[in-house]
Swiss-Prot record:
Single Gene Ontology BP annotation: translation
Organism expressing this protein natively: Triticum aestivum
Organism lineage: Eukaryota, Viridiplantae, Streptophyta, Embryophyta, Tracheophyta
Listed GO MF terms: structural constituent of ribosome
Record's keyword annotation contains Ribonucleoprotein: yes
Subcellular location: Plastid, Chloroplast
Descriptive protein name: Large ribosomal subunit protein bL33c
Assigned keywords, A-Z: Chloroplast, Plastid, Ribonucleoprotein, Ribosomal protein
Signal peptide: none
Gene that encodes the chain: rpl33
Length: 66
């Protein structure tokens, strides 16, 4: 039987370059990736280098709050 909340949760990673660019200029969109993380192993926020199709390069993607 499972105890308490689920250990694995779904998180959304968002490109920080698109978010910053969107405030200053007109942006075509914001790159987002969906993934899972284990709360016990990674209690902090996730940060990955992933490909952003709007920036057309590999950029840092941070976990966003729901």
């Amino acid at each position: 039987m499972a105890k308490g909340k689920d250990v694995r949760i779904r998180v959304i990673l968002e490109c920080i370059s698109c978010v910053r660019k969107g405030a200053n200029e007109e942006s075509t969109g914001i790159s987002r990736y969906s993934t899972q993380k284990n709360r016990h192993n990674t209690p902090g926020q996730l940060e990955f280098k992933k490909f952003c199709r709007y920036c057309r390069k590999h950029t840092t993607h941070h976990e966003i709050k729901k």
